[in-house]
UniProtKB/Swiss-Prot annotation:
This is 1,4-dihydroxy-2-naphthoyl-CoA hydrolase. Its EC number is 3.1.2.28. GO terms for biological process: phylloquinone biosynthetic process. Disruption phenotype: Cells lacking this gene accumulate DHNA-CoA, lack phylloquinone, and display photosensitivity to high light intensities.
Length: 138
């Protein structure tokens, strides 16, 4: 299975009063990794928004936490695609410390392609299917 890796530093704004990454920021980092992967595949979320013939709503998100991260930490977000079909796909994420490889969190997001304006399930456009297949089956 192929993996896309996104590296990110933890900033002070990512942390809470206890000095650790606030829980929702881990999901934000996952979405940053997703957008970075799309960019590497020349797939534009802005193009989806401006053309407006389909959308990829996130219909489920889950995350499990194993260890904290702190301001200044370098993190790796590894993204793999699972459970891909003609109209949906799941992104699995593992967030770890860049230096020690300690696993901090695992997350998953489910995305479904819908036609607009009907908002009915639709097949993913071919460029998306190709990119997903490339990451799902290297």
């Amino acid at each position: 299975m192929g993996t896309f890796t996104y590296e990110r530093q933890v900033y002070l704004a990512d942390t809470d009063g206890a000095g650790v990454v606030y829980f929702n920021q881990f999901l934000q980092m996952c979405h940053e990794a997703y957008e970075s992967w799309l960019s590497s595949e020349h797939l534009s979320l802005q193009n989806i928004i401006s053309v407006g013939d389909f959308a990829l709503p996130l219909v489920h998100a889950s995350i499990d936490f194993f260890a904290p991260a702190h301001c200044g930490d370098r993190l790796l977000v590894n993204l793999t695609i699972t459970q891909a079909s003609a109209h949906r796909f799941c992104c699995d994420y593992e967030i770890s410390q860049a230096e020690s490889a300690q696993l901090l969190a695992r997350a998953q997001t489910h995305h479904v392609c819908i036609a607009l304006p009907e908002r009915k399930k639709a097949p993913l456009p071919q460029p998306w299917q190709t990119a997903i297949c490339d990451l799902d089956h290297p």
